[in-house]
């Protein structure tokens, strides 16, 4: 019998991406504290959060658990997820006209073997200079 595949995410985009593979899966969102540890670099942070999400979902379901976390690194600092619309405006203004790195940590956890398979992917982005009006219309 094949193990069930579990997506440890509430992200509609991640759900859509996995659905495009044609695999049958169950969604078991995991809510964890997503704060960076003191002096933790962005790559280790993204992988740690992805692994913690997978482990949290493994408390509810068995199988192959897929979890991911994406962060932005700007000038060696982690840019957190926006807390609200005002914060989203602040973050996009901060990124406007600058180079930054988008880092996704992926963790696949096999609950039967208690084994992780991980990968970290970096995308280098140069954002155009955006006006406040452009940023507001995007948000």
Regions found by a protein language model. Name each.
Residues 2-23:
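N-terminal beta1-alpha1 ligand-phosphate binding loop
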Residues 2-4, 41-139:
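Anionic-ligand binding patches
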Residues 24-35:
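A short beta-strand-loop structural module common to alpha/beta enzyme folds
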Residues 12, 32, 113:
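Short, glycine/serine-rich, charged loops/turns that create anion-binding
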Residues 8-11, 30, 96:
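Short linear Ser/Thr-Pro motifs
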Residues 16-20, 37, 59-60:
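Short loop/helix-cap segments at secondary-structure boundaries that form the rim of catalytic
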